[in-house]
């Protein structure tokens, strides 16, 4: 009986510890910047260009280092 209790407790512990905590910020969508033309080397510069395009931010992404703008979906 004690072994079954321990097994059930351990299973519940593993189950609850593997649950991801989801914040209230929602999903983030990405779109390639239309105004950032060259290789993206600075996330800060990318974010400034994206804010001027009406997005909430931006970051350099991918092998070719392109600027992708981000916003809440």
From Swiss-Prot:
Keywords from the UniProt entry: Antimicrobial, Disulfide bond, Fungicide, Plant defense, Secreted, Signal
Disulfide bonds: 29-73, 40-60, 46-67, 50-69
Similarity comment: Belongs to the DEFL family.
Signal sequence coordinates: 1-26
InterPro entries: Defensin_plant, Scorpion_toxin-like, Scorpion_toxin-like_sf
Gene Ontology annotations of biological process type: defense response; defense response to fungus; killing of cells of another organism
Pfam families for this protein: Gamma-thionin
SUPFAM superfamilies, A to Z: Scorpion toxin-like
Keyword check for Plastid: no
Protein name, entry field: Defensin-like protein 6
A GO CC term attached to the entry: extracellular region
Function description: Confers broad-spectrum resistance to pathogens.
Entry annotated with the keyword Metal-binding: no
Compartments it resides in: Secreted
């Amino acid at each position: 009986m004690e072994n079954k209790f321990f097994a059930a407790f351990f299973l519940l512990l593993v189950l609850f510890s593997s649950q991801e905590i989801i914040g209230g910020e929602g999903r983030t969508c990405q779109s390639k910047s239309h105004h950032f033309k060259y290789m993206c080397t600075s996330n800060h510069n990318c974010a400034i260009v994206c804010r001027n395009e009406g997005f909430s931010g931006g970051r350099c992404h991918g092998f070719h280092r392109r600027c992708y703008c981000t916003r809440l979906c």
